[in-house]
Each structure stands twice: as structure tokens, then as C-alpha cells.
Amino acid sequence: MFEAIFPSTPQARLKRDPREKPGLSSFRSTFRQQSSLGLCIPRLMLPKEASPSQRHSSMSSSMARALVLLQSMASRDARCPEWKPHQKPRTLSKSVQTISRYYRKTSEPKDAASLTGFMSKMELRRVFPTHPDCPQFSTRATSMSHCGSPTEADLSGEIDNSSETWRGTQDLFLARRGSDTNVDGYLLPFSKSICEFDYLRKRRKSQTLSPVTSSSVASQSCLRKRMPWYLSVIHEKDHCLSELEIQVQKKDEEILLLQEEREALKMQLKCLLKGKGQETSMSPGRREQLSDASLKLGRLSLLKAFSRHEEELQHWWQMQEESAAPERGKEPDLGGGEEDEGLEGEPDGVEDTGAWGGVSQMGSVHEEGSEEEEEEEGDRDEDSEERELPEEEEIPRRRASSLAESFEEELLAQLEEYEQVILDFQFNLEATRTRYSLATGVIASLQQQVDFQETQLRKINTENETLQKELRERRQQLQAMTDKFSNLREDKKHQEMMGLIEKDNQLLRQQVSELERKLTKRDCVISELDTKVSQLQEQVELDQNHLQRWKQLQEDLQSKKEMIQQAEQHTRVALESSQSRLERLRNKIIQATFSISGTKSLANEISDNDILEALQRIISERSDYYNQLKQKGVKVPPLQQSEAFLTSKSKKGTSK
């Protein structure tokens, strides 16, 4: 029932008025307009199509009239009652009657009835934090101190907005300064929290001991207004909601940054796959050098960025756990609401700096890597020009292909790790949303308690007023009858008149009681119908909002699924092409080595070690044949130095 009246989701709460835009500003404006009236004054029955300025002007005019009437009634009750002839009572609106009853009750002296009312209020305030719908009530946001604190600009904006909304009602409340005094003659101060009662009592005692005679201090004390005790709590809950919304926006920005990094890595992978086809036309030495340099640079940049992100995530989780541990074990403290505000903004700042720092570090590493590539290319251009034989190109090609494959595997692993990080951030975002819904539930429970207290207060005030009116009317009638009967001389006429008057009184009492019963029944029926209509309207709005939200979520999930399928197809095509190229190269090497006469035809499957041994044997036989010819004195052109270097390098590799 109360979830329909006070919805916990932000979409349902923001769409309470169809003219308002869904956002934080509209929510705050409507919330402050309701709370500025003290939550004890019923809102005027205005149509929804009326603008906020018209509603505010109508509220202010009605409040001004009600306060003037209230002041006159309070001054009339303070004087001695004067007997006047019976007049027709003036009918007032329900809002004016409610305001007059509330302020008359607060301005009455401390008799037995007021003492019982005050004790009941204090008992209700003491028991309220233990209510099951209110989790460990305090004057600040419950278990939300680790979620972060707003910046100074946000705080200044909040102060400006609240001052503008309260400035209109401040002038109106100054008109009832005379009726806001208690028995001691002091103005009743703000009721901010339960923990401030002792301070206010001590301050009153100090004022009675050492009164201030200056007119400036007296004028400032007269400007203080009386407000309900729960307003400060509701304002702090609103402040906590604004902080949570700011944090949700920050998390969304971080998720966008991570998605952009993932797209950049995908683009790098595509560029590498495109550049792989161009590497076949390059010389073997230069291709090998470029592949080694690019592999080293890619590994460096990716490993550094990933390690930095891991450190930042671990640091952020540690800060979250450290800030959440003392909040869980702490007793409900109603007065300490401003202790942990300095530590709330640290995790978000660490995350922002970590994300931007990782991006800048990756950019700097790529710049340094490009400079090193240019220097190495200039140094090794001369060595690569000497390698011209086709047989020497096979080994660098094979190495370049293996390096490219390992680099592609590392890039794929990095992409999977970044997707895991994005999932973690989404989980944190859901946690903040659940905390946001908890805060809205606390506000709804507070509003429920306020409405319940107001209804009880209205019932008691209406009963008291009806009894007082009946008493006054009966006194006036008795006074008139005694005046008449004193003028009568005959006893019989006097007795007959008294009997008739008593019968009339009984009939009138019965009629009045019946009319009162009918009136109360009608009022109850009207109030129940109004509540049912409002509940049904809000339920319809909630259902519409939920439908729209589910549709939007379904569309987003469908688009994400299509993007993931496209990326998977691209990666599969690239992997199959690279495997086919590697298989063709291996087949060519096998054909070149085992097609020579004198080689053994292996019946089993040819392994990489067999191919390597065959190549080494061919090279060693060639060098032996060259040495034999040289020893016999046959003139043979000398072998090139690069060939001898390659044979020694291959022998070292086999020995290892």
C-alpha cells in the first residue's frame, strides 16, 4: 500500500507529475515544496494542470489568511471569555481549520492535557528508531557514508536551491511570532534531532540566568521558527540521494571509458591483422625486427595498463571494505552525522585518476615505442640488404608468424580481462542502486509515520473542538433560559417551561449526535475513496514506467548480443586464416626438405624436430662438400658470411 503511495524507484518517483521532466531537479523541487509546508499542513486541492507558480501563490495566500486567523484566535483564547449573544458560527475551510487547530494546540499552556500530549510525542520519537521499517535511524544517511561525498559546487547549489524555496515561507511564518511562545516566554526553536534536546534545555537555563538586554539579539531570537523534528532527517535523506545519483553518473562514465578502451584494442587487432598481409613483401630481417619490436611494445603497454587497473581495483575494494566495516558494527548514533564526510569522496577520485592515468600511460608507452622502432629500423636497414637468397627467408617468416600468433593470443586474453572488469563495474553499479532504493524506503517510512501522527492529531483536535463548541452553546442556552425564568412570577409556568426546555434539549442532543455520526461516516467514506483513487492512479503510473523500462532493457540486451556475435565471427575468421597460412608454410618446408635425393621417407607423421634435423643435415653436408672441394684445390666461389652465421646459430639452437 505504502509502496504505491511513496514509490521507491526513481523513475516512478520522478513521473509523479506529467508536466515535470524526469530528472533530479524536478524531484528536488517537488520534494522541497512538500516539505516547506511543514508536512502538517494539507496540500490544497489544486488541479494537476496548474503551474507551480500558481500553486505556490495560492498556498501562500491561504497560509497568510490562516495565520492571521490563528493569531486572532490565540489572542482571543488568552483573554477572559466574554458572554455574547448567540451568533451564527463562521464556516472556515478545512485547511484553515487544520492550521488553527495545530498552532492552537502548540500555543496552549502546560496543563494536564498538554503534558500527556508532550509525553506521548516524546515516547513516539523514542520508539521510532526501533521501527522495523526504519533501519537504525540517524540524522544522517544510514550506512551510506562510504558512498562518497558531493563536491563544494554541488553543496553550494543545494544551499542556493533550498534557500530559494524556504525564503517564500519564511515571511509567512514571521506573522505568528506572538503565538509561538511557550510558558516561559521564549520562542520554540527548531527541532532538528533528538540529541539536541539537552543542548536546547541548557541554553534556555543559561538564558534565564543571564538574560541578554540588547535589542539586536532579541530581534534575532524572534526570527527563529518552530519546525517539525523530522524535516532535518528528510532533507538529509534527500542529500544522500543526490550523492548516490552523482556516484551512479560517475560509474556510467567509467564504464564508457572502459568500452572505448576495448574498442581501441579491437581496432589495434584489426590493424595488426591487416598489416600481417603486408609483411610478406618486406625483407626477412626487417620484418623480424619490426615484429619483435611491436610485440615487446604491445606486451609492455598492455601489461602495464592491466597491472595498474588491477592495483586500482584492489585499492578501491579495500577502501570500500574499511569504510563499511565500522558502519556495520556501530550502534545507532543519532547525533553524529558529520564525522565521516571527509572520507566519502576517496574511492571515486581514485578510480577516476586510475582510469585516466592508465590511458595516459598507454599513450606515452606507444610514443616511446614508435621512437625506438624508428631508431632500430635505421640501424638495421643496412644488415637487411645483404640477405638476398630465397632459402634464408624461410626461418624469419616462421618466427614472425609464431610471434604474431602469440601476440594475437595475448590481445584476446586482454580483451577477455577487460570484459571481466566491465562486468565488475556493472555489479558495483547495481549495489549502489540497491542502496539508493534503501534510502528511498527509509524516506517513505518516515513519511508514513508523519501522516499517521497527523491523522491522530487531527482526530483529537476535531473531538476537542466539537466538545468545546457544544459546551459553549449549552452555556449560552442555559444563561438565556435562566434570564427568562427569573422574569417569570408564577411557579407553574416556570416548571412547565423548564420541562419543555429539557425535552427540547434532549431532542436536540439526539439530533446533534445523529448528525455528527452521519457526518463522520461521510467523511470517512470520502477519505477512503480519495485514498483509493490516488493509489490506483499511482499504481497505473508505476506499471507504465516498469513496462517502458523493461522494453528499453530488452532492446539494449539485443543490441549488445548482436555486437558480441559480430566480434566473435571476426575473430574466428582471423584465426582460421592464420592457421591455414601456417599449415601451408609447414607443407612447403616439408616438400623442400624431403624432396631432395638421399633423404629417408618417413612412414609416420613428420614432426617439427624431424624437419629441423633434415635442414641442419643439408646445411652441414653442403659445408662439408665445400671444404672437400677446397682441400682438393678446386676453385670454388667462397660461401657468404651470413650463411656461416646462420649455420652456427642453428647449431647453437639445437644444442640448447
Curated annotation (Swiss-Prot):
Keyword vocabulary terms for this entry: Coiled coil
Region (Disordered): 1-31, 139-163, 320-403
InterPro entries, sorted: CC-FHA_domain
Transmembrane segments: none
Coiled-coil segments on the chain, per record: 241-278
Extent of the signal sequence: none
Bias kind Acidic residues: ranges: 336-351, 369-394
Biased composition, class Polar residues, residue ranges: 139-148
UniProt cross-references to PANTHER family, sorted A to Z: COILED-COIL DOMAIN-CONTAINING PROTEIN 27 (PTHR18853:SF9), FORKHEAD-ASSOCIATED DOMAIN-CONTAINING PROTEIN 1-RELATED (PTHR18853)
Listed name of the protein: Coiled-coil domain-containing protein 27
Organism: Homo sapiens (Human)
Lineage: Eukaryota, Metazoa, Chordata, Craniata, Vertebrata
Gene name of the record: CCDC27
